[in-house]
Amino acid sequence: MEFWQHIYSNFNVIAFSIFGLKVHWYGIMYVIALLLALLLAKFFVKKFQLDINEKHLDSYFIWVEIGVILGARLGYILIYDANTMYYITHPWQIFNPYINGEFVGIRGMSYHGAIIGFLIATLLFCKKYKTNPWIFLDLVALSVPLAYVFGRIGNFLNQELFGRITNVPWGIYVDGILRHPSQLYEAFLEGIVVFIIVYLARFKQSFQGELILVYAGAYSLARFICEFYREPDFGIGFVLWGMSMGQILSFIMFITALLVYICIKFKKVNI
């Protein structure tokens, strides 16, 4: 366990450089996650014979990727970043990948902000092409969780979003302090476990939109649990009743998904 506990001391967050441009492992994991999500979506379209053509699917993923990036970055700045006012007065710095002249990529993304950007992009896309948004949302619920695993592995390799102080033997040292590898807990619970739940729910699906609601509920519950092992965001700490901002947002997400599910499932609301 000695090597594992000191893995950050023996690992470079930069995978390689091209003409002086440093390529980080996080960026590589992000690209893998994006491609895997698209490939899984195409697989599930064929497997479950969904009424989505490949051209629309490719276009849709471009739309939602833009929405996710915008939502994730803006969400982080508005919710988590300690320099919110700076970015509001200097909006051109929001997507600036350079710090002191060095390319470091775009840092600081919020998952809950990404969700909002994703939903807006989905609604705009479906309105433009006159398609049913619930079909696409259910497809995303199936294809995203496994891809999400690579996103959290990317966080781990980038040595960010680390866990709380611990004494468990599988902990890792971060700046000389033993901490939970919470990114890997999240990869398992929020990625693999959530996928299994959504995939099994597909075979008992009773209405369009059910899978995305199951995903939202399962993810928010998994995230709420993982937050107990994840270090609260810098500058925010614990917000209410000993809960982190991630837990509060996950709680809101869970209640929202549950209420919508109940309204549709038991009150026969047309969608």
Curated annotation (Swiss-Prot):
GO terms for cellular component: plasma membrane. The lineage of its organism: Bacteria, Pseudomonadati, Campylobacterota, Epsilonproteobacteria, Campylobacterales. It holds the Pfam family LGT. GO terms for molecular function: phosphatidylglycerol-prolipoprotein diacylglyceryl transferase activity. A 1,2-diacyl-sn-glycero-3-phospho-(1'-sn-glycerol) binds at residue 152. One of its GO terms (biological process) is lipoprotein biosynthetic process. It is an enzyme of class 2 (transferase). This is Phosphatidylglycerol--prolipoprotein diacylglyceryl transferase. Pathway: Protein modification; lipoprotein biosynthesis (diacylglyceryl transfer). It is a multi-pass membrane protein. Keywords: Cell inner membrane, Cell membrane, Membrane, Transferase, Transmembrane, Transmembrane helix. Coiled coil: none annotated. Catalyzes the transfer of the diacylglyceryl group from phosphatidylglycerol to the sulfhydryl group of the N-terminal cysteine of a prolipoprotein, the first step in the formation of mature lipoproteins. Belongs to the Lgt family. Its EC number is 2.5.1.145. It comes from the Bacteria. It is found in: Cell inner membrane. The keyword Membrane applies. It comes from Campylobacter jejuni subsp. jejuni serotype O:23/36 (strain 81-176). Signal peptide: none annotated.
